[in-house]
Amino acid sequence: MLLPQLPEDAHGPSVKSSGVVFYNPAMAGSRTRSVLLFRHAMEEGMLGDGTVYALDGLTASGLRARRWLNELPCEISSRISATIVDLEKESLDWARSSHKEFPPSDGVGDLQTFQGDLRAAVLSSGRHWIDIDPYGSPAPFIDSAMQSMARSGVMEVSATDTAALTGSSKTALMRRYGARVRTDCLAHDSGMRVMLSCISRIAARYDRAIEPLLSVWDSHHLRVSFRVVKSVSSANELEERIGWRVFSPRKEEVAASIDSGLQVETGGDVLPMHCMLPLNFPVDRKDPRVSGPLWIGPTGDRGAMASMSEE
């Protein structure tokens, strides 16, 4: 598969510049996990029985979508109608020529291009699979993407504004995500949970609920992958999955966490390093021990993660 030319010493993300096809080798693992998760979702019936309309937003080289078509089994890739989206004409021209020169080995799989804003692209048609991998925060794109989701589909969202999500840039975190995060050894996990909390709130506006499949902190970015289901009843249960994380909790906080089913009762006098609390617990938002609001449910699905393991 043809790749954009990079300097021999290139590692990780680089600054995007107009007229240059952007390719980040540090995201190779992310693209591999996307292929594996796509296969799992198809095999589990998450994407329906007909044509699967998939969108690779902010695509740059188009490599993620091309890997879907090249690496998934024929019975899966033949059902995929993939659209790659980018503002740069050069990127889309390069992706098209690469796809033509190195087509899928089985000769199936549809690849379309859309030059323009991702928000316009997602609203132009319904989608079963949407990948959002921006240079910075994904916050501006989530609402429009959620509106275009099918009744059952999968969305994957990356964020490289890790300074904000891990609490180092507190003002940016509050502006973009409406939360606070304690900067400690749990900050990256808290950041992923803040992402899931924000996304779940947006989903609920459109009578949808999310079910996390995989959450990853990998080098320079955080990434969450989740199923989106159209369900008013599940959307109404939103607040049951959002709450607070408290570092070095007091006895009464641990007791409340246990009573809410968020903490396993172990007995003894040793308190846990942290605990989760429901949204209605009266925390002091100025307390430096507190992170949130954030997702307090599971951040992944056992079956999805097992499908990515070597036997």
Describe the function of each predicted region.
Residues 1-311:
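SAM-dependent transferase fold signal centered on methyltransferase-like domains
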